[in-house]
Amino acid sequence: MRVFWHYMTQLVSPIHMHTSMFTKSIKFLASEEQAKRWLPLIDNFNILGCYAQTEMGHGSNVAGIETTATFDIKKNEWVIHTPSIRAYKFWPGNLGRHSTHAVTFARVIVSDNDYGVLPFMIPIRSRKDHLPYSGVKVGDIGTKMGYDTMDNGYLAFDHYRVPADALLKRFVNVDSEGNFELRGDPRAIY
């Protein structure tokens, strides 16, 4: 029986999180314009992604997330930062070795106001050579007992800059002047 279960757990594809949580997050959380730009790349596996919400110090407690996304109005960019080891994204499947992008949840700060935790589409590795971008720490945490094919990993940011459009905008927007607009029920984001 042990051999049977070992075999069955190995049937999960290393890109399972890409085709499930990552793709569905973009379909549900991205604006129509963002989805039109990213989904063809995702569907053709030109972008490989993961869903990075869980943090070491908070598990899946979204309210406790410490990773920050601070809006730089002058440059129209987000500065993504991991302020402590507790804020490292930890365990996301497909993150350790495969992902080039991550749907990452971070606490949104605009003009010193905390607007809560929102999702971002963040490039973490080059699609050309698969190396992490400067300001991104990413790696594999080793095998998971009984789930060897899943490459769980860790992710941290050191004042990593991404374009304003990295914020997934179906339910929220921050314009170039830093005005925050929520569309619909914020519970739909999680």
Please state what every model-predicted region is.
Residues E32-K36, G59-G64:
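Fold-level signal for large, globular catalytic cores of enzyme and receptor domains
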Residues S25, Q53-S60, R86-Y88:
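Sensory/regulatory domains in signal-transduction proteins
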Residues M1-N46, R97-H98:
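Internal helix-loop-helix
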Residues I73-K137:
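A short core secondary-structure module
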Residues N46-Q53, G135-G139:
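Short Pro/Gly-enriched beta-strand edge/turn motifs at strand-loop
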Residues G142-Y190:
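Glycine-rich beta->alpha junctions and the first turn(s) of the following alpha-helix
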